[in-house]
A protein has these predicted regions:
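C-terminal membrane-associated helical module and adjoining short loops/tails
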Residues: 125-202
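Helix-coil boundary and interhelical linker segments in multi-pass alpha-helical membrane proteins
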Residues: 24-39, 78, 82-103, 143-158, ...
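C-terminal ends of transmembrane helices
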Residues: 53-61, 110-124, 167-177
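Multi-pass membrane catalytic core of lipid/isoprenoid biosynthesis enzymes
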Residues: 11-16, 57-112
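Topogenic membrane-insertion module of multi-pass membrane proteins
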Residues: 1-52, 168-201
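Hydrophobic alpha-helical transmembrane segments
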Residues: 15-26, 44-52, 75-85, 103-108, ...
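"…together with the soluble PPM/PP2C metallo-phosphatase catalytic core" -> "…together
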Residues: 3-15, 22-26, 34, 39, ...
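Hydrophobic core segments of alpha-helical transmembrane domains in multi-pass membrane proteins
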Residues: 37-44, 99-107, 155-166, 185-188
Length: 202
């Protein structure tokens, strides 16, 4: 009999790493270390990008598969719904309209996650996502941080970025699921963004 609940094997290790990076990133953001906080968001994105691919290569029971799906969704909530909002607040975006945009963003993110979970339970064989996957928030928010740092308009670009991303979460558009070389391309983009954050981030 196991002493602890859950599963702790290579099929979920990246998901746990993503959760840990999100919590660390929020702590760094609230401590004013924005560059390192944003780098943690890059880690969250990379972890979520590849965790499913690794999990599918592992031999798992049905219970382990379901557990993986659930913790992946919960991790996405922390990493790509709450974490970007904390980054925005830590940048000083705390006026009433910033808060309103942040609330809309979180609601859109959880709506997108809920829709994905229902769709996945019905069919996992589709070749397209409906609505922007929340993982892409990492690329968008990090890009906004870089642009804002270069142009000194972070207080403007971040709320706009969150609003547009929120709309894309719930907009009924089809987005092809990444496969093959797309994973390599997204990985290279993540590396490029991380390097840019290091050199131009505040």
């Amino acid at each position: 009999m196991k002493m602890f609940l859950g599963y702790y094997n290579k099929s979920v290790i990246l998901t746990y790493i993503g959760s840990a990076a999100a919590v660390l990133g929020m702590a760094l953001a609230l401590s004013g270390k924005m560059k390192y906080a944003v780098l943690c968001l890059v880690v969250c994105g990379v972890a979520d990008l590849f965790d499913g691919m690794i999990a599918r290569r592992c031999k798992r029971t049905e219970e382990e598969k379901e557990f993986g799906i659930q913790i992946d969704s919960l991790t996405d909530m922390v990493s790509f719904a709450v974490f970007p909002v904390v980054i925005s607040f830590a940048m000083g975006n705390t006026s009433w309209y910033h808060i309103a945009i942040s609330v809309f963003y979180v609601l859109a993110a959880i709506t997108r996650l809920g829709f994905f979970n229902v769709s996945a339970s019905i069919s996992s064989e589709t070749k397209f996502y409906t609505g922007l996957p929340v993982t892409f928030a990492s690329l968008i928010v990090v890009s906004a941080f870089i642009a804002g740092s270069i142009l000194s308009i972070t207080e403007i670009i971040m709320p706009v970025c969150l609003f547009v991303t929120a709309v894309l979460f719930i907009l009924k558009i089809k987005i092809a699921k990444p496969k093959g070389i797309a994973y390599l391309l997204l990985g290279l983009i993540a590396i490029a963004l991380a390097v840019a954050v290091i050199f131009v981030g505040g």
